[in-house]
Amino acid sequence: AKNQFVSLFTYQANAVLNSDVDESEKEALQTDLENYSGIDELLEMYCQNIELQTDKKTVDAVLEVPKELTNFNDFYAFRDRKSGEVYEFPTDGGAAISEKTATMLGVKAGDTVQLKKGDDIVDVKISIIVENYVRHYLYLAPDLYEELFGGAPDYNQLLMKYQDMSGNYETALGEKIMTYDGVAAISFTSDLIDQIDNMLRSLDIVIVVLIVSA
């Protein structure tokens, strides 16, 4: 699971925006972050809980749509788990789907799944299957999303890349970002990695206790 936040999700922080945030406030936040010391890159994302369906199975998943594809590979790594082959974001009218999700749905590249978002149900072709360890994901290019749903999504997350992952830097950055009314929450990749490390250490202790008890 730790590999997810080290090798596959390669951004350092994620600001989640309120559903009622207006464009002017979003632009002000972006401008401030672009000028904030140490911030290298930003990427707007749309993130929404969905259902993926085939004749065999229904899976709860997360739909991810980047506003721009030009720097997407700086924030996420799309690759085949077995071969290590690196993929570009699909622009052939199809989606990227996480590996375990594809396995559970019984689909491969070239197959079609049903995407249910609220009251909308659309058919989506799978172009690539990507390595993933935590949760289930489907990724759509912004133009494909518009084609399927009749308009652009309300981009509700802002991903950040920077080098300084020290506690002092991230505390100051978090305090700055949370001064904006339009921001609901901020999460740091370093915190997620720490949580996973702590969980694994706890499991190791449990295993040792079980072995000693046995």
Could you describe each region identified by the protein language model?
Residues 1-27, 156-160:
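Membrane-interface junction motifs in transport/secretion proteins
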Residues 1-4, 111, 119:
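Long hydrophobic segments that form regular secondary structure
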Residues 2-4, 60, 169-214:
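Peri-transmembrane interface segments
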Residues 8-9, 89, 129-174, 190:
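Small-residue transmembrane helix packing/gating motifs
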Residues 10-12, 39, 47, 58-60, ...:
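Active-site lining segments that contact anionic ligands and/or coordinate catalytic metals
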Residues 18-20, 97-101, 162:
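Structural motif
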Residues 27-109, 123-125, 129:
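Short beta-strand boundary microenvironments
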